[in-house]
A protein has these predicted regions:
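N-terminal alpha-helical scaffolding segments that mark the starts
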Residues: 1-71, 86, 93, 105, ...
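C-terminal non-catalytic interaction modules
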Residues: 2-33, 37, 79, 121, ...
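Structural signature of alpha-solenoid helical repeat junctions
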Residues: 8-10, 30, 47-51, 69-72, ...
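Residue register of alpha-helical TPR repeats
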Residues: 13-14, 33, 52-56, 75, ...
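Residue-level detector of the short coil/turn that links helix A to helix B
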Residues: 26, 67-68, 110, 159, ...
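Alpha-solenoid helical-repeat scaffolds
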Residues: 30, 325-485
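Amphipathic alpha-helical segments of tetratricopeptide repeats
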Residues: 36-44, 78-88, 120-135, 169-177, ...
Length: 728
C-alpha cells in the first residue's frame, strides 16, 4: 500500500486494512499477524484509543475462534476494556462485546469468580445504556439473553443449580419479549439440561422435557431444517432423559432421528466445505492486482453465486456463520452464537447412543461397527490435540483440557460398551484387552479421567466374575461402590457384588449377599426408572431360591420379568429371568411350563452368543429330560452342553493365560496420582468431563460443577448387561 511509506500512523492503518482484507479472504493467520503487528511498537503508539480497542477485540476474537492463545486473548481483552471504559464516545455494543468475550475467556481459564464479576459489570452497563436510550430495545434484549446464558454457565460451574436456573429464567423472559422461537427453545433446552444435572424433582424434569418438545413441534419446517445445532442439542437431551427414566422404546425413536440427521448433516457439511473452498479461491483471485475488467466482473458474479448458494444451504444471514458451519453447530443468534459440543463430538455421541440402544437388544454387529467408527474418530481428534502414544496429562496445554477431557471420556464410554458386548458374547480376551486400554488411559490421564475410576473397577469385577473369579469380582464391585457417590451406581455395585457372593456357593457368602441386597431391596422404589429395581428383584429371587423358597421366588421374579420385558427391553436380562423361572418351574414339577420357558430363554441366549447362560439353560434342560425320563433327549442335550462347556473352557483358558489377566483380576485397586495443579484447573473448567457421578456432556450455554462426564446423562449402566451367573 502506498500508505505504508508514510508516517507511523499510516503504517498502523495499513496493517489494520490488510487484516480486514485477510479476514474477508478467511486467511485468519495473516489477519492475526497484521493485527499483532499493528498493536506492537512502533505502530501501537500511533493508534487512537478507540482504534486500538477495536483492533484488540478483533485479534482476541480471532484467537478465541481458533481456540489458540487464551492467555494472549485475555490480555488483549483486559487492555481493550481499560481503553473503552473511560471513552464516552465508544459504542455501547463494543463495550458489551468486550465484557462478553472477556467473560468467555475467564470461563475457559476456569476463573469463575472473575467471569461472574465481568458479567455483572456487563449487565450493569447494559442497564445503563438501555435506560439512556443509547441501545435500542431489541439489541438490549439480545444482550440480556447473552449475559444471562453466560451467567447460568458460571453458576453451573460452581454447582449452584438454583442460581443457574434463575439466570436462565431471566434470559428466557428476554427471549419471550423478543418473540424469538430460536431463543425460546435455546433457553428451554438449557433449563432441561440444568434439571437433568441436578435432578431434584422428577416432575420438574418431566415438565422441562415436555416444554422442549412442545417448542420444537411448534417450529416451522424451515426453522427445523436450519437450526441444526438446536436439533442435535434438544434431541440428545431428550434421549438422555428417556434413558434415565428407562423409556428405551421412546429413546430409540430419538436415536433413529439423530442417526438419520447425522448422515444428512455430514453430506451437507461436505458440500459447504467444498463451496467455501471454492469461494476462498475466487476471493484470492479477486485480490490480485491488474485484473481485467471482464475477468473481475466474472469473478464478482461467481463470488455472489457461491455466497447465495452457501446462504441457501445453511439458512444463515451472516456469511461468517455460513463459512463456519462446517466446524460448529450453532445454538443461538448473535451475539450469543456458541456451540454445545464440537460438531465431531456430537456425531460421535450419536454413534454412542446407537450402541446404547442396540446393545440390550443384542444387535452386536451394528454395535461393533459404531464402536470401531467412534474410536477411530476420537483417536483422530485426540491426535489433533497432540495426544498420541506416550503423552500424558502433564503435557497438555490448559486450553486443551476441556476438549481433551470430552474426547477421552467419550473414548472410555466406547471402550466400556466394547467390554460389555464382548463379555456378553463370551469373547473374554477382547473384553480384557479393551479393559486394559481403559486402565492405561486412566493411568495416563488420572485427573481428567478420575471420575471413571469407579466404572473401571466395576468392569474389572464384571470381567473377574465372567471368568469365574467370584471373590475377586466381589472385591472390585465393592471398591467401585466406595469410589462413587451416585446412589444408582452404588446400588448396582451392591447387586453385582451380591451375585458374585451367591456364585461362590457357601453359606457365609450367601449371608453376605443378603446383607448387601437387603438394604437395596428396601429402597429400590426410590430410583428414577426401573433398571435398579429389576436387577435387585433378580438377585433377591436368586437368594429366595437358594433359601428353598421357590414359590415366593417365582412370584417376585415374575413381577421383575414383566418390568424387564415391557420397559427395559434388555434381552439378556430377560433371558436370565426366564432361565431362573424355568428352573423354579422344574423344582415345582411344572415340567410343561418349564420346557416352554427354557426354550424361549435359550433362543435369546443364542441370539446374544451368551455361552455361559446357554450352558446354564442346557443343564436345566438335562434335569428336565431326566425328570420326564426322556433318556434320548437327556443324552443328546448333555452332549450338546458338553461341547458348549469345552468351547467355554477354551475361551476361559485363553483369557486366563493373557498377560493382562492377573493385573485386572487381582484384589488391588488401580493406583493413580492426579496432578494437584491440573486437578484444580480441571475442577474449575466449566465444561470439564471426567466424573462418573455426572452423566452428561457439557454445553457452552450450561456447564457442570466439578469435573464431569458424558455419563452424567448417558449412564451406560442403565442398559448394562446383567452379570452372568452359573447357579446349579
Amino acid at each position: 500500500m502506498s500508505a505504508a511509506a508514510g508516517p507511523s500512523m499510516s503504517a498502523a492503518d495499513g496493517l489494520l486494512a490488510l487484516a480486514e482484507e485477510a479476514e474477508r479472504r478467511r486467511d485468519f493467520s495473516t489477519a492475526a499477524s497484521c493485527l499483532d503487528s499493528a498493536l506492537s511498537p512502533p505502530h501501537a503508539a500511533s493508534l487512537l484509543p478507540l482504534a486500538e480497542a477495536r483492533a484488540r477485540l478483533r485479534l482476541a476474537a480471532l484467537l478465541l475462534a481458533r481456540s489458540k492463545g487464551l492467555a494472549t486473548a485475555k490480555a488483549h481483552l483486559e487492555r481493550a476494556l481499560l481503553l473503552l471504559n473511560p471513552l464516552p464516545s465508544a459504542p455501547p455494543r463494543l463495550k458489551l462485546l468486550a465484557h462478553s468475550l472477556l467473560a468467555n475467556v475467564y470461563g475457559l481459564l476456569g476463573a469463575v469468580p472473575s467471569q461472574k464479576h465481568v458479567l455483572r459489570r456487563g449487565l450493569a452497563l447494559l442497564a445503563s445504556a438501555s435506560a439512556s436510550g443509547l441501545l435500542p430495545a431489541e439489541p438490549s434484549l439480545l444482550w440480556t439473553s447473552n449475559f444471562q446464558a453466560q451467567l447460568a454457565s458460571a453458576f453451573a460451574a460452581e454447582g449452584d443449580a438454583a442460581s443457574a436456573l434463575s439466570a436462565l429464567s431471566e434470559g428466557a423472559a428476554a427471549a419471550t419479549e423478543l418473540e424469538s422461537p430460536q431463543l425460546d427453545l435455546f433457553f428451554a433446552a438449557n433449563t432441561l439440561h440444568a434439571h437433568l444435572l441436578c435432578w431434584e424433582d422428577s416432575n420438574s424434569v418431566a415438565d422441562a422435557a415436555a416444554r422442549v418438545a412442545d417448542l420444537w413441534d411448534a417450529l416451522t419446517d424451515q426453522e427445523k431444517e436450519h437450526w441444526v445445532g438446536l436439533f442435535f442439542y434438544t434431541e440428545l437431551l431428550q434421549t438422555f432423559y428417556l434413558l434415565r427414566v428407562c423409556d428405551y422404546k421412546a429413546a430409540s425413536k430419538h436415536v433413529e432421528r439423530l442417526d438419520t440427521a447425522v448422515k444428512s448433516e455430514m453430506q451437507r457439511g461436505q458440500r459447504i466445505k467444498e463451496l467455501g473452498t471454492e469461494l476462498s479461491a475466487v476471493e484470492r483471485s479477486l485480490a490480485q492486482p491488474m485484473l481485467k475488467e471482464r475477468e473481475r466482473a466474472a469473478l464478482v458474479h461467481k463470488q455472489r453465486q457461491l455466497k447465495d448458494q452457501l446462504r441457501a444451504l445453511c439458512g444463515y444471514d451472516e456469511l461468517n456463520d455460513v463459512l463456519d458451519y462446517g466446524d460448529k453447530l450453532l445454538l443461538a443468534p448473535p451475539p450469543m452464537h456458541g456451540e454445545w459440543l464440537p460438531r465431531t463430538a456430537v456425531f460421535v455421541l450419536v454413534d454412542l447412543m446407537v450402541v446404547m440402544v442396540s446393545r440390550p437388544k443384542g444387535i452386536f454387529r451394528e454395535c461393533g461397527k459404531r464402536i470401531q467408527s467412534g474410536l477411530q474418530i476420537i483417536h483422530e481428534e485426540l491426535s489433533k490435540l497432540g495426544i498420541v502414544d506416550g503423552v500424558t496429562e502433564e503435557n497438555l496445554e490448559h486450553s486443551a483440557i476441556w476438549t481433551a477431557g470430552l474426547y477421552l471420556t467419550l473414548l472410555l464410554q466406547f471402550l466400556e460398551n466394547s467390554v460389555a458386548v464382548e463379555l456378553t458374547r463370551s469373547e473374554f480376551v477382547e473384553a480384557l484387552e479393551a479393559l486394559a486400554q481403559m486402565k492405561n488411559w486412566l493411568t495416563r490421564f488420572p485427573t481428567i479421567l478420575q471420575g471413571s475410576e469407579s466404572t473401571i473397577e466395576m468392569l474389572r469385577g464384571q470381567y473377574a466374575h465372567s471368568v469365574g473369579y467370584f471373590d475377586e469380582a466381589a472385591f472390585h464391585f465393592l471398591e467401585a461402590l466406595k469410589l462413587t457417590e451416585n446412589k444408582s451406581m452404588q446400588s448396582m455395585c451392591q447387586v453385582y457384588a451380591a451375585v458374585s457372593y451367591i456364585c461362590k456357593g457357601d453359606a457365609e457368602s450367601s449371608s453376605e449377599a443378603l446383607e448387601l441386597i437387603g438394604p437395596a431391596y428396601r429402597t429400590m422404589d426410590s430410583f428414577v426408572g426401573v433398571r435398579e429395581k429389576t436387577c435387585i428383584i433378580f438377585v433377591y429371587g436368586l437368594l429366595l431360591m437358594r433359601q428353598q423358597n421357590p414359590q415366593e421366588a417365582r412370584t417376585r421374579l415374575a413381577s421383575g420379568l414383566k418390568i424387564a420385558h415391557q420397559q427395559l427391553g434388555n434381552i439378556q436380562l430377560v433371558s436370565q429371568y426366564l432361565t431362573i423361572l424355568g428352573t423354579l418351574a422344574l423344582q415345582l414339577h411344572d415340567t410343561g411350563q418349564a420346557k416352554e420357558i427354557l426354550k424361549s430363554s435359550f433362543t435369546l441366549a443364542k441370539t446374544l452368543y451368551d455361552i455361559p447362560t446357554q450352558i446354564w439353560i442346557l443343564s436345566v434342560f438335562t434335569e428336565l429330560y431326566r425328570e420326564l425320563e426322556e433318556r434320548g433327549n437327556e443324552l443328546e442335550n448333555s452332549g450338546y452342553a458338553s461341547k458348549k462347556e469345552i468351547d467355554l473352557q477354551k475361551r476361559l483358558t485363553e483369557a486366563r493365560s493373557h498377560p493382562f489377566h492377573q493385573e485386572l483380576v487381582e484384589k488391588v485397586r488401580i493406583e493413580i496420582q492426579p496432578m494437584h495443579d491440573l486437578m484444580q484447573k480441571h475442577h474449575e473448567m466449566p465444561g470439564s468431563v471426567a466424573n462418573a457421578d455426572l452423566d452428561i456432556p457439557e454445553s457452552v450455554g450450561l456447564s457442570t460443577p466439578q469435573p464431569s462426564s458424558v455419563r452424567r446423562l448417558i449412564d451406560t449402566s442403565s442398559v448394562r448387561r446383567s452379570t452372568r451367573r452359573r447357579v446349579s
